[in-house]
């Protein structure tokens, strides 16, 4: 399955697609988005 993800950031809204076997953070990084995280 593929999901449409809407990310609301201080810079604006971004939309990405993500498969059910992929982490949202990884999908965002592939699209060039720099999301804050501390879980890796």
Swiss-Prot record:
Major localization class: plastid
The protein's required cofactors: [2Fe-2S] cluster
Alphabetized InterPro entries for the sequence: 2Fe-2S_ferredoxin-like_sf (IPR036010), 2Fe-2S_ferredoxin-type (IPR001041), Beta-grasp_dom_sf (IPR012675)
Cofactor note: Binds 1 [2Fe-2S] cluster.
Gene Ontology CC: one annotated term: chloroplast stroma
Protein origin, superkingdom: Eukaryota
CDD domains for the chain: fer2
Localization per Swiss-Prot or TrEMBL: Plastid, Chloroplast
Alphabetized SUPFAM superfamilies for the sequence: 2Fe-2S ferredoxin-like
MF GO annotations: 2 iron, 2 sulfur cluster binding; metal ion binding
Binding residues annotated for [2Fe-2S] cluster, in chain numbering: 39
Domain 2Fe-2S ferredoxin-type: 3-40
Keywords: 2Fe-2S, Chloroplast, Electron transport, Iron, Iron-sulfur, Metal-binding, Plastid, Transport
UniProt key word Plastid: yes
Family membership: Belongs to the 2Fe2S plant-type ferredoxin family.
Function: Ferredoxins are iron-sulfur proteins that transfer electrons in a wide variety of metabolic reactions.
Protein name per its UniProtKB record: Ferredoxin-2
Upper taxonomic lineage: Eukaryota, Viridiplantae, Streptophyta, Embryophyta, Tracheophyta
């Amino acid at each position: 399955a593929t999901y449409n993800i809407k990310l609301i950031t201080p810079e604006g809204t971004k939309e990405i697609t993500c498969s059910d076997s992929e982490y949202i953070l990884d999908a965002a990084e592939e699209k060039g988005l720099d999301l804050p995280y501390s879980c890796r």
